[in-house]
Curated annotation (Swiss-Prot):
<dbReference type="InterPro" id="IPR023580">
    <property type="entry name" value="RNA_pol_su_RPB10"/>
</dbReference>
<dbReference type="GO" id="GO:0003899">
    <property type="term" value="F:DNA-directed RNA polymerase activity"/>
</dbReference>
<dbReference type="GO" id="GO:0003677">
    <property type="term" value="F:DNA binding"/>
</dbReference>
<feature type="binding site">
    <location>
        <position position="44"/>
    </location>
    <ligand>
        <name>Zn(2+)</name>
    </ligand>
</feature>
<dbReference type="GO" id="GO:0000419">
    <property type="term" value="C:RNA polymerase V complex"/>
</dbReference>
<dbReference type="Pfam" id="PF01194">
    <property type="entry name" value="RNA_pol_N"/>
</dbReference>
<keyword id="KW-0479">Metal-binding</keyword>
<protein>
    <recommendedName>
        <fullName>DNA-directed RNA polymerases II, IV and V subunit 10</fullName>
    </recommendedName>
</protein>
<feature type="binding site">
    <location>
        <position position="45"/>
    </location>
    <ligand>
        <name>Zn(2+)</name>
    </ligand>
</feature>
<dbReference type="GO" id="GO:0008270">
    <property type="term" value="F:zinc ion binding"/>
</dbReference>
<comment type="similarity">
    <text>Belongs to the archaeal Rpo10/eukaryotic RPB10 RNA polymerase subunit family.</text>
</comment>
<feature type="binding site">
    <location>
        <position position="10"/>
    </location>
    <ligand>
        <name>Zn(2+)</name>
    </ligand>
</feature>
<comment type="function">
    <text>DNA-dependent RNA polymerase catalyzes the transcription of DNA into RNA using the four ribonucleoside triphosphates as substrates. Component of RNA polymerase II which synthesizes mRNA precursors and many functional non-coding RNAs. Pol II is the central component of the basal RNA polymerase II transcription machinery. It is composed of mobile elements that move relative to each other.</text>
</comment>
<dbReference type="GO" id="GO:0000418">
    <property type="term" value="C:RNA polymerase IV complex"/>
</dbReference>
<dbReference type="GO" id="GO:0005665">
    <property type="term" value="C:RNA polymerase II, core complex"/>
</dbReference>
<feature type="binding site">
    <location>
        <position position="7"/>
    </location>
    <ligand>
        <name>Zn(2+)</name>
    </ligand>
</feature>
<keyword id="KW-0240">DNA-directed RNA polymerase</keyword>
């Protein structure tokens, strides 16, 4: 969904690093090098960025208020 604001394990703020992480990946950094550049050294924080799946854009396509006509 949306990147969590804090790491689930240690509580470090990581939500502000998501866009920078994606930018570094676009510049052909490896995942490890991008996380090193963002100064994320704890494996729990690294996990939060590496395993996040951004689904918010896909979910915005669905309108929960629409009723389907199943007659």
């Amino acid at each position: 969904m949306i990147i969590p604001v804090r790491c689930f394990t240690c509580g470090k703020v990581i939500g502000n690093k998501w866009d920078q992480y994606l930018d570094l990946l676009q510049l052909d950094y490896t995942e490890g090098d991008a996380l090193d550049a963002l100064q994320l050294v704890r494996y729990c924080c690294r996990r939060m960025l590496m395993t996040h799946v951004d689904l918010i854009e896909k979910l915005l396509n669905y309108n929960t208020l629409e009723k389907s006509d199943n007659s």
